[in-house]
């Protein structure tokens, strides 16, 4: 119990944190929560672990607030949510309070380890991760590849600050609870819930700073959340979560992989600079539709591939574009993954092997 309270208290001791007034209100809220360390004390209710990492969903115009305050305000301001929220136990684990645009591999690994640990607890129904929108799609895909469970795991967020006009975070959080409770969410991998839609962690992309900006390209959403409940219309077909060969328990650091873009007048010196920095692999955000490099980049990339460095071709046209294997070169085809997601998969692949054929197999399967 002490450990959990210490985890929650971390949020109040980081540099640049809330104003004294916000801290005081949060302290009162924590005292209210302390007896049971959860919203809802009935042991027969489904238990949802909430892994909180900050983000706009836990920010107001006055500054940062704990996610517990966000939930308390939802309960107070929207009594129609009480039936749902009172039907579950919510336990909060505050692990990070950093803007998601500042996340490093350490934060990603910490989140993955935490989610993987708590999801294994037999009494846990599922996990909700709240974070900033900036890297939601990367967090979701990272967890999608690493967490070993069929239980529902939902990442949600907010584009507008809590308590402001048009705030979307309150609805997103309530919808996330509904999705975790849905039996249809079991075995679907890591899901991103935003603007009443359910997206796969593999495909979702933030397209703007507006509510409703999380989309999945031509593939479409997995499902939707409406007044009468949660509805799924398709399921991921690529390997993920419990069917993944990647194991967070064996990974302490991530290999260095950089993304290089193709464009006119592209200078191959940038590729050489990445090599000089010690990269173990390169993802090319290449030309649509081939995912190929600019002509000036081609010789150096081909030489690196011949020497055994994995060079993954992706297309800057986005997920509506599929890059296929070219038997004439040794580049790895990134399929329809966006460059920054291909980077995640390549990093994890390199924790297992440096064999180019094996890495291509992984890109074919994930």
Label each PLM-derived region with a short phrase.
Residues 45, 51-52, 58, 74, ...:
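Accessory alpha-helical/coil subdomains and C-terminal extensions
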Residues 25-36:
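Bacterial N-terminal signal peptides
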Residues 289-366:
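C-terminal non-catalytic interaction/assembly regions of soluble proteins
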Residues 1-22:
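N-terminal secretory signal peptides that target proteins for export/translocation
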Residues 129-151, 294-301:
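Short Gly/Thr/Asp-enriched flexible loops that form oxyanion-binding sites at enzyme active sites
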Residues 155-227:
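Internal gly/pro-rich beta-alpha loop/helix module
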Residues 121-136, 277-290:
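Short acidic, glycine-rich surface-loop motifs adjacent to enzyme active sites
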Residues 41-118:
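ATP/NTP phosphate-donor binding region
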């Amino acid at each position: 119990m002490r450990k959990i309270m210490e985890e929650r208290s971390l949020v109040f001791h980081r540099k640049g944190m809330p104003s004294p007034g916000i801290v005081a209100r949060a302290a009162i809220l924590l005292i209210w929560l302390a007896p049971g360390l959860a919203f809802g004390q009935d042991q027969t209710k489904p238990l949802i672990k909430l892994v909180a990492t900050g983000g706009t969903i836990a920010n107001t115009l006055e500054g940062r607030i704990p996610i517990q305050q966000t939930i308390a305000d939802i309960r107070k301001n929207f009594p129609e949510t009480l039936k749902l929220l009172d039907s579950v136990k919510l336990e909060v684990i505050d692990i990070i309070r950093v803007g998601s645009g500042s996340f490093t591999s350490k934060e990603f690994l910490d989140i993955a380890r935490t989610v993987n640990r708590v999801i294994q607890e037999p009494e846990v129904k599922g996990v909700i991760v709240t974070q900033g929108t900036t890297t939601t799609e990367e967090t979701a895909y990272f967890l999608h590849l690493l967490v070993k469970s069929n239980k529902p795991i939902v990442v949600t967020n907010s584009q507008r600050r809590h308590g402001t006009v048009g705030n979307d975070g309150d609805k997103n959080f309530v919808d996330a609870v509904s999705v975790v409770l849905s039996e249809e969410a079991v075995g679907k991998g890591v899901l991103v819930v935003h603007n009443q839609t359910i997206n796969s962690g593999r495909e979702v992309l933030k397209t703007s700073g507006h509510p409703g900006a999380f989309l999945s390209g031509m593939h479409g959403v997995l499902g939707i959340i409406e007044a009468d409940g949660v509805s799924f219309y398709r399921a991921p077909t690529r390997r993920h979560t419990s069917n993944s060969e990647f194991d967070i328990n064996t990974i302490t650091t991530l290999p260095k992989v950089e993304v290089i873009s193709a464009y006119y007048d592209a200078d191959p010196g940038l590729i050489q600079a990445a090599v000089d920095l010690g990269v173990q692999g390169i993802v090319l955000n290449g030309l649509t539709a081939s995912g190929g490099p600019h002509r000036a980049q081609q010789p150096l990339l081909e030489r690196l591939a011949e020497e055994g460095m994995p060079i993954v071709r992706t297309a800057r046209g986005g997920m509506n574009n599929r890059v296929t294997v070219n038997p004439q070169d040794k580049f790895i085809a990134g399929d329809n993954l966006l460059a920054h997601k291909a980077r995640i998969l390549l990093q994890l692949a390199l924790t297992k092997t440096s064999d180019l054929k094996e890495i291509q197999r992984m890109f074919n399967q994930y």
